[in-house]
Swiss-Prot record:
It comes from the Bacteria. Its cofactor is heme b. CDD domains: catalase_peroxidase_1, catalase_peroxidase_2. The active site is at 96 (proton acceptor). Gene3D superfamilies: 1.10.520.10, Peroxidase, domain 2. GO terms for biological process: cellular response to hydrogen peroxide; hydrogen peroxide catabolic process. The record marks 92 as: Transition state stabilizer. Binds 1 heme b (iron(II)-protoporphyrin IX) group per dimer. This is Catalase-peroxidase. Its EC number is 1.11.1.21. There is a cross-link at residues 95-218 (Tryptophyl-tyrosyl-methioninium (Trp-Tyr) (with M-244)). PROSITE patterns: PEROXIDASE_1, PEROXIDASE_2, PEROXIDASE_4. Formation of the three residue Trp-Tyr-Met cross-link is important for the catalase, but not the peroxidase activity of the enzyme. It comes from Clostridium botulinum (strain Eklund 17B / Type B).
Length: 730
């Protein structure tokens, strides 16, 4: 075989598979369907039948914790521990793993082990956490498949806290590693690290972001955009922590508790620091930020640029942080690295901080601008002073907030694994009552289905209600879904997308069926309204398929229970309200983001693939499930009949589409020959004929020999959504 040389220059070509100008380069606004096909088995080194939960059960949990405790003080020559203790470093590692979570879309957080991959492994705020993970490698190697990286990062943070004197609330395992960066997470649009193009108006942060600058976990420790303004910093802190689902008390507890330990590193100019892991030379083997100042570690370490510890005894749980914060006046200085920070004035000997490497040296305590926000902000200050007066409350509240921080993205407590799962449940976990009764049998299901069929509710009412109940699910943080029946509670029952008046009528009818069944059976057998809502959707689809000439059975698994209002945090659930739902052709208002992009975003949160999303859209349209009974996209003359008409008519070349509005958000389809108006549509409808990938899928379902395939695929995708939150049956 001859080498691939240029016949003119004789030089080798540079092209390799996957290189060259991409479609995204040519068409930057192209619909990104890749986010619907992440984490396939092709990128996963584990076998298809690998079950992490089963492997975790084999873990010697206590032996692992002993090894982690020992690691805390096992200082390594290649990265010496500050004060001889890695605990503070591991707390930061765990915090920064979990702290990327944002409540707006449920993405980020520690449940996937994303800190191992770009961009997080190379964020400026994560400088030197590559060393923390590398210190953990011998333990990960020892326990192997029995503990995921995602679980290990969080558990190590717990052990660090415990080893330094804090009683934690517990630990729940069950975080399953992914094996590639996640493309669905929007980290911002800035092209430079620490860029801040995400705020508008009165420092209103762009949704769903929860950090003020690109590459930060929360806020700039020097102050807003590096301006040492404590009150301005407190504003940023409040905004970012709220977007992580933390209130003011939890925020103060987390900051004060976290800064009880360890120190910041800014020994010299950042110019001594090399590239982050993703850009580091191959010989560095995944480590980054190589420091050429002095020894490159220990007292010569360069990290955030700030330098020093917050209090004396930085490896012990004490009240020293709050005591120091309020005891002293503070002077603004610049660290050796040139970063703004604050040093205590006239420090008593007992509050001086021993050097991290040389015990003969002492330093004044330091505070960041964000720390001083806790002292001077009118809301944070009394909370912090109250904690100073009540050490037990402070320890309890920090432990509670830490547990929430590290478990917020794991979903219901039923997913937690291990011997340290707290018995107590918390409202932020969206608790659902346990099943304490016999479940309905196949015979009962047949009986209830007949009652639903005879109730007078339409096919579209039944299907739309089931969809409204189940489609709140988010695969990101495992929240939402049909279990709990919260569609009948605040705030969901009054969401605009759910058409409250119509919803109330449907729920009242289904509730009566539930009550009649339960009252006519023994107390140990019951059916929940949550189950009946989903069963109603099954009935609707079966009837629609029957009208199309197919007798099919939609799978149904009972076992859902009904939560009560007291178990439902209205403010917390408000973030689940759909601002758009392309499956119901709903858009609350006009947005900068195109409706078709919002559809892809929602489909990804629902864990749908592109074919599943496509078949669901086609089915929901012909089932007449649009918001407010809109006719947009209902490309059929036989609504509530489960046919492939949506695809057949969308791809019909006898239809000419024209924008109905200047902004091209609605369209009209005219007969090419007669000019007669045939259909109306939204961008969400027409994207399935416009986008080349989606059109290819739509063509499959429009084929004459795929009518039954369409029905079967629709039922499969439908069932996936109806059971998305049924972790106990997976």
């Amino acid at each position: 075989m001859t080498e691939n040389k240029c016949p003119v220059t004789g030089k080798m070509g540079k092209a390799t598979a996957g290189s060259g100008t991409t479609n995204k380069d040519w068409w930057p606004n192209q619909l990104n369907l890749n986010i619907l096909h992440q984490n396939s088995q092709l990128s996963n080194p584990m076998s298809k039948d690998f079950n992490y939960a089963e492997e975790f059960k084999k873990l010697d949990f206590q032996a692992l914790k002993v090894d982690l405790y020992m690691l805390m003080t096992d200082s390594q020559i290649w990265w010496p521990a500050d004060y001889g203790n890695y605990g503070p470093l591991f707390i930061r590692m765990a915090w920064h793993s979990a702290g990327t979570y944002r409540v707006g879309d449920g993405r980020g957080g520690g449940s996937l082990g994303l800190q191992r991959f770009a961009p997080l492994n190379s964020w400026p705020d994560n400088i030197n956490l590559d060393k923390a993970r590398r210190l953990l490698w011998p333990i990960k190697k020892k326990y192997g498949n029995k503990i995921s990286w995602a679980d290990l990062l969080i558990l190590t943070g717990n052990c660090a806290l415990e080893s330094m004197g804090l009683k934690t609330l517990g630990f729940g395992g069950g975080r399953v590693d992914v094996w590639e960066p996640q493309e669905d997470i929007y980290w911002g649009s800035e092209k430079e690290w620490l860029g801040d193009e995400r705020e508008k108006g009165d420092k209103e942060l762009e949704n769903p972001l929860a950090a003020v600058q690109m590459g930060l976990i929360y806020v700039n420790p020097e102050g807003p955009n590096g301006n040492p303004d404590p009150l301005g910093s407190a504003h940023d802190v409040r905004e970012t922590f709220a977007r992580m689902a933390m209130n003011d008390e939890e925020t103060v507890a987390l900051i004060a508790g976290g800064h009880t330990f360890g120190k910041c590193h800014g020994a010299a100019s950042p110019s001594y620091v090399g590239p982050a892991p993703e850009a580091a030379p191959i010989e560095e083997q995944g480590l980054g930020w190589k420091n050429t100042y002095g020894s490159g570690n220990g007292d010569d370490t360069i990290g955030s640029g700030l330098e020093g510890a917050w209090k004396a005894n930085p490896t012990k749980w004490t009240m020293g942080y709050l005591k120091t914060l309020f005891k002293y006046d503070w002077e603004l200085v610049k660290s050796p690295a040139g970063a703004y920070q604050w040093l205590a004035k006239n420090v008593d000997e007992e509050d001086m901080v021993i050097d991290a490497e040389d015990s003969t040296k002492k330093h004044r305590p330091m505070m960041t601008t964000a720390d001083l926000g806790l002292r001077y902000d009118p809301i944070y200050e009394p909370i912090a002073r109250n904690y100073l007066k009540n050490p037990e409350k402070f320890a309890h509240d920090f432990a509670s907030a830490w547990f929430k921080l590290t478990h917020r993205d794991m979903g219901p407590i039923s997913r937690y694994l291990g011997p340290e799962v707290p018995k107590e449940s918390f409202i932020w976990q969206d608790p659902i009552p346990l099943v304490k009764h016999k479940l309905i049998t196949k015979k009962d299901i047949t009986h209830i289905k007949k009652k639903i069929l005879d109730s007078g509710l339409s096919i579209s009412d039944l299907v739309a209600t089931a969809w409204a109940s189940a489609s709140t699910f988010r695969g990101s943080d495992k929240r939402g879904g049909a279990n709990g029946g919260r569609i009948r509670l605040e705030p969901q029952k009054n969401w605009e997308v759910n058409e409250p008046k119509k919803l109330n009528n449907v729920l009242n009818t289904l509730k009566q069926i539930k009550e009649n069944f339960n009252s006519s059976h023994s107390k140990d057998k019951k059916v929940s309204l949550a189950d009946i809502i989903i069963l109603g959707g099954c009935v609707g689809i079966e009837q629609a398929a029957k009208r199309a000439g197919y007798n099919i059975n939609v799978p149904f698994i009972p076992g859902r229970t009904d939560a009560i209002q007291e178990q439902t945090d209205v403010k917390s659930f408000a973030v689940l309200e759909p601002k758009e739902d392309g499956f119901r052709n709903y858009l609350k208002t006009k947005y900068v983001v195109k409706p078709e992009d919002m559809l892809i975003d929602r489909a990804q949160l629902l864990t749908l693939t592109a074919p599943e999303m496509t078949v669901l859209i086609g089915g929901m349209r012909v089932l007449n499930c649009n918001y407010n009974k809109s006719k947009d996209g209902v490309f059929t003359n036989r609504p509530e009949c489960l046919t492939n008409d949506f695809f057949v008519n969308l791809l019909d070349m006898n239809t000419v589409w024209k924008p109905k509005s200047e902004d091209k958000d609605r369209f009209e389809g005219f007969d090419r020959e007669t000019g007669e108006l045939k259909w109306t549509a939204t961008r969400v409808d027409l994207i399935f004929g416009s986008n080349s990938q989606l059109r290819a899928i739509a063509e499959v379902y429009a084929c004459d020999d795929n009518k039954e395939k369409f029905i079967q695929d629709f039922i499969f995708a439908w069932n996936k959504i109806m059971n998305a939150d049924r972790f106990e049956i997976k």
